[in-house]
Design a protein with these regions (language model features):
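Short secondary-structure junctions
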Residues: 36-37, 41, 96-105
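N-terminal regions immediately upstream of nucleotidyltransferase
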Residues: 1-45, 49-58, 69-81
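Catalytic cores of NTP-dependent nucleotidyl/adenyl transfer enzymes across multiple folds
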Residues: 24, 91, 99, 103-196
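Short hydrophobic/aromatic beta-strand micro-patches
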Residues: 64-66
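Residues that form generic nucleotide/phosphate-binding pockets
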Residues: 6-7, 29, 93, 180, ...
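Phosphate/oxyanion-binding active-site loops and adjacent basic polyanion-contact surfaces
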Residues: 18-23, 83-86, 173, 177
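A gly/proline- and charged-residue-enriched helix-loop-helix capping module
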Residues: 82-98
Length: 196
């Protein structure tokens, strides 16, 4: 069986394929409901450990789905907990594709538990715009806890920061290994020189 090793654990190619298939189907359901599109790839991205490539299993696949800014305005204007209602609308869109799955809202996300142990957490988000209407790279997302409010995230920046930290660690490790190799070569050279 083909596998990909991640930090000592294994996520099989079959599991990755199943995650990808479910991701595409959920994306299509959300796009159909909120964008009037049948695309399986636009307006969504993997985030969290799976998005960073550091996942060790499939028990928590995080997805950000971008919704139209008009939907933000609609749910923000509602009296009461509009954020909770947004999560319910997203849940209902996904239920159209996965009617037999355990799906529920949980704080900021819609959770989909599959019987095979794979779990998705889908975060609905809206591009945050600057004063001129340009996207600033950040997203607003709902928090239905304590009456509801909006929070902000920048997943691309977080992914880039993680890549930079990993690169720094690799450079540090590479430098350390290089120093060790030079030390060993020096010792071997001295030993060989003494034996000659």
């Amino acid at each position: 069986m083909d596998t990909v090793r991640k930090r000592g654990e294994i996520i099989s190619i079959e599991q990755r394929s199943l995650v990808s298939q479910r991701y595409r189907r959920m994306t299509r359901a959300v796009n159909s409901e909120f964008w009037g599109s049948t695309s399986e790839t636009t307006h969504s991205l993997y985030v969290g450990s799976y998005g960073r490539g550091t996942a060790i299993d499939t028990s928590d696949i995080d997805i950000l789905v971008e919704l139209p800014r008009d939907e933000y305005n609609k749910y923000d204007a509602l009296r009461g907990n509009g954020q909770s209602r947004l999560l319910q609308a997203l849940k209902n869109a996904i239920l159209q594709t996965y009617p037999n799955s355990d799906i529920h809202g949980d704080g900021q996300v819609v959770v989909i538990n599959f019987s095979d142990g794979i779990k998705f957490e889908v975060l609905p988000a809206f591009r945050q715009l600057d004063w001129w209407g340009n996207w600033n790279g950040k997203y607003d997302y709902p928090d239905s806890n304590m009456g509801g409010n909006w929070l902000t995230t920048n997943p691309k920046s977080e992914q880039q920061a993680m890549k930079e930290k990993m690169l720094q660690a690799m450079v540090c490790y590479s430098t350390h290994v290089s120093t060790c190799v030079k030390f060993v070569i020096t010792i071997l050279g001295v030993t060989i020189f003494r034996e000659s």
